[in-house]
Amino acid sequence: MIPIYNQYAKNKSGYLHKDFQLFHLKDKKQQEFEFHYHDFKKIIIFLSGKVTYIIEGKAYLLKPGDILLVDNHDIHKPLIDPSETYERIIIWVNTSLIEAYRSNDCDISLCFQLIKEKKSNLIRLETNSKDKLKSILTELETIMTTDAFGSTLLSKALFIQFMIYLNRIQLTKQPHNMDGAIT
């Protein structure tokens, strides 16, 4: 049973003190989350498991490769089946970073605006799009674990590249990407 959505949730979760933070998590355990929100934007790349994610009262049954966009202050929570390994990449994004890279011909926050217009937080990717984004994320994850010359700047450049491709995908997607919504 899907829990009742509480639009008045007061549970603020997580604090971001840098431009963005990437977490690659893999676990198989009982986890229960309350409805909560963040002051930053959140991108969830679902890799494996059996998870239903509730965002602003809408539930999404996730498939490997799905991407969820959670805008700042959107109330959300995952429902996780503990019998399966849950693997995901989560990126917390500071709104100020997105604002800093806004220009007349490129607004990397557009994908977060489009989720409101399309009434769907889910991006379900085709194979070629998955491969492109996976390649960028793999390189980003590697760079973020090193202190080699230019790693901070390169990680920011890779993140911006990821956001540009994510926006291109979202701009070409038709509303059929709603097929993951179950409520």
Question: What are the functions of these language-model segments?
Answer:
Residues 57, 66, 80-82, 177:
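Short, solvent-exposed loop/turn segments at secondary-structure boundaries
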Residues 2-21, 79-142, 168-172:
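A hydrophobic/aromatic-rich effector-binding and dimerization subdomain
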Residues 48, 72, 93-95:
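Residues immediately flanking
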Residues 1-67, 74, 106-107, 117, ...:
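Generic protein-terminus/edge-of-domain signal
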Residues 119-128, 144-155, 164-183:
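Short, Lys/Arg-enriched, Trp-marked, Pro/Gly-tolerant hinge/linker segments that flank
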